[in-house]
Design a protein with these regions (language model features):
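Generic recognition of flexible, low-complexity loop/linker segments
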Residues: 121-122, 238-240, 311-314, 323-326, ...
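Structured loops at beta-to-helix junctions and adjacent beta-edge loops in soluble globular domains
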Residues: 62-67, 137, 186, 198, ...
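Active-site-proximal structural scaffolding
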Residues: 24-26, 32, 190, 206, ...
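N-terminal, post-signal-peptide metal-ligating segments of extracellular/periplasmic oxidoreductases
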Residues: 2-6, 11-155, 159-165, 169-174, ...
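Active/binding-pocket-proximal capping segment
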Residues: 330-333, 338-362, 395-399, 409-416
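Compositionally biased low-complexity segments at domain edges in trafficked proteins
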Residues: 227-261, 428-430
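Beta-propeller domains
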Residues: 319-326, 332-336
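Extracellular/periplasmic metallocenter environments
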Residues: 139-154, 158-162, 166-227, 361-430
């Protein structure tokens, strides 16, 4: 854990390792509503953003705004905070968030996303050595036109960053309403990272401006160690021995939601963050049982009340396959995740392979993984029997929805089928 770690909502948190060294130059964008650059088309992909560009040059365009989402049906009222009386039909909670607008080619299309934020933010995935440009547009807040909050993009854990691109507004730039800023990155270290807005970060992170980013290792596609012929050549890290090889991957952004703070932001009130008392505990922006609902698309109304919470946390695999679980915590509480009846092997912490100075693997076999605020873990599981297994927070206090009866909160399901039940995975969380 780095010196920026936090256990209370009083500021930013660090991932605690040397990760990506930023270089090159980025450029300020034009006025958003005056002109709009053309970006590459994006195939429909509800989980991980497919960046535009061929080869090692990748471009992504994100927009920051506000919107409405839904907590699990049947959650008891906590008036006046939940459900929010200003929420449109089908929704109950006010949020801030990011949207992927990479495929949009006109200013009008991008502007139409205002007031339609999603949580958690789009997952981003890049390869080692990619030249990455992420353009952030600030669309403003539809519900709060009185606010002129800027937004930034902070790649959590990328140390030694050029301040201009680090996203900490005190040391760099914030994107004002109606403007763009392009961030430039060249990732050199594989691992599981996260990103968030660092402008008024205690508020903006709690309100939903959090997402995950993966850097895939250069070792991918290469047979190393004792990896058998025919096995999928995907790895979590450049391990050199194949010990982090996996068949499927699923990512989880761990957060909490304090209904009172979300209500106050919608109703022009101020929160005292020392009173922090979450009402809901979420995986990828959803509480159980919504966590096991299918992936959605924020552009489609078919998702109903989960339209703007499009990322599923359901884990599926065939018996005997190895599954990579990417865990990131941008909440303000510690979370200890337990997987019933399936051993877990922790191979990395904070985007750093667990390896000793002598080169030996220091992986940890366990049934519970602790993830502190601002931290990440990479975990491998290989189920040996068919069935359904629960992955959940070990603190039962975090397994409810707004204090209501029954199970809820930070819980999902690992569903293991016979060989051949699930075809090859093409995207994370599918």
């Amino acid at each position: 854990m780095s010196d920026e770690s936090r256990s209370t909502p009083t500021g930013g948190a660090g991932l605690g390792r040397r990760a990506v060294v930023l270089g090159g130059a980025g450029a300020l964008g034009s006025v958003l509503l005056a002109s709009r650059a053309t970006f590459g088309q994006q195939a429909k992909r509800p989980t991980v953003v497919r960046a535009a560009g061929a080869g090692p040059v990748k471009s992504v365009h994100l927009a920051g705004t506000d919107g409405w989402v839904s907590m699990p049906a049947g959650s008891p009222p906590d008036l006046p905070f939940y459900p929010d009386s200003l929420a449109p039909p089908g929704f109950d909670t006010y949020v801030f968030g990011f949207r992927d607008v990479t495929s949009m080619t006109t200013a009008q299309e991008v502007a139409a996303v205002r007031g339609k934020a999603q949580i958690s933010a789009p997952m981003l995935a890049f390869d080692e050595g990619d030249e990455v440009t992420i353009t952030l547009s600030n669309l403003g807040l539809l519900m709060r036109p009185d606010l002129f909050d800027g937004h930034t993009l902070h790649w959590h854990g990328f140390v030694n960053a050029i301040p201009l691109f680090d996203g900490v507004p005190e040391l760099s730039l914030a994107v004002p309403i109606g403007r763009d800023l392009s961030y430039y990155y060249r990732p050199h270290d594989a691992g599981t990272y996260m990103y968030h807005c660092h402008f008024e970060d205690v508020e903006h992170v709690q309100m939903g401006m959090t997402g995950m980013v993966f850097v895939r290792p250069a070792q991918n596609g290469t047979r190393v160690g004792s990896v058998p012929t025919g096995a999928r050549l995907t790895y979590a890290y450049n391990d050199g021995d194949g010990s982090t090889r996996y068949d499927r991957e699923f990512a989880f952004m761990l957060t909490e939601l304090w209904s009172a703070a979300h209500y106050r932001d919608a109703h022009i009130q101020v929160s005292d963050w020392t009173d922090y008392a979450p009402s809901f505990w979420l995986l990828n922006g959803r509480g159980y049982p919504d966590t096991v609902a299918p992936n959605g698309d924020p552009r489609s109304t078919a998702g109903g009340r989960l339209q703007y919470q499009p990322i599923s946390s359901l884990i599926t695999c065939n018996v005997g396959e190895t599954v990579l679980l990417r865990l990131s915590n941008l909440g303000y509480q510690n979370h200890a995740l337990t997987l019933d009846n399936v051993d877990m092997q922790v191979v990395a912490k904070d985007a750093s392979l667990l390896r000793g100075r002598d080169g030996s693997n220091n992986y940890l076999s366990t049934n519970t993984v602790d993830v502190g605020p601002g931290e990440s873990r990479d975990v491998l599981v290989t189920p040996r029997v068919e069935g359904e297994f629960l992955l959940y927070d070990r603190s039962y206090a975090y397994l409810g929805n707004g204090g209501g009866p029954g199970w809820g909160g930070m819980m999902t399901v690992l569903r293991v089928g016979p060989a051949g039940t699930y075809g090859p995975q093409t995207e994370p969380n599918t």
